[in-house]
Amino acid sequence: MARTAVVTGGMSGIGAATAARLRADGVTVLTLDISPEADLVADVTDSGAVRAIAAAAGEVDVLVNSAGIVGPNAPLWEVPADGWERTFAVNVRGTFNTCQAFVPGMIARGWGRIVNIASIAGKDGNPNMSPYSASKAAVIALTKSLGKELATTGVLANAVAPAVIETPMNADTGPDALAHITGLIPMRRVGQASEVAELIAWLCSDRMTFSTGAVYDISGGRATY
């Protein structure tokens, strides 16, 4: 059956790799991004814009929430309030906005797949990255709650928790922080966006039928629980 997916943050990094991987599976993909080259141009923090796009997009079967920012790199006591709030606005409120806009249509049709991009930082906490770590912990909790709420509807919601992935977003990660978190990976390398996209593609497919509200680590062995 033909499926349609919306991938937020779909113009770069994990989002772009996921869009390409889903297209290879025959999925019609609409990228949602602030980039003017995206299929759907919007800021995920703007709930009105997201709702308008959802209303105009037609039937959407798959939602991948990949839009995100690293936020401030500093000890918690030096983090500016606006940096904290912006990180939560994009990473958490953006995920909330898109889920709220697209999930009702999936419920009505009795089938859907939602994959939220969290981070291993949301489980372990990265030093000097408290806004990012806390925001990704919130994405994990949101996904667990949503998965339970949808469990009998045919719509499945899961999260992936990558370790460091080679993406443009990590250009905003301080070199000391990047070296520290890369050193925690037993495989001794960063991941590739295409590797994460393989996992996401499975979570978006008909092949995955008995998992919801789960968190899938893709961390090169870093995960501690």
Where are these regions (language model features)?
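Alpha-helical segment proximal to the catalytic Tyr-Lys
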Residues: 104, 148-152
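Residue(s) in the substrate-gating loop at a strand-loop-helix junction
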Residues: 119
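Substrate-binding pocket helix/loop in short-chain dehydrogenase/reductase
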Residues: 74-76, 83-85, 114, 181
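Short, small/polar-rich loop/turn modules that mediate ligand/substrate recognition or access, typified
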Residues: 151, 156, 211-213
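Conserved glycine-rich cofactor-binding loop
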Residues: 11-12
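Active-site helix of classical SDR
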Residues: 99, 135, 143
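Short C-terminal tail/terminal secondary-structure segment
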Residues: 73, 124, 184, 212-225
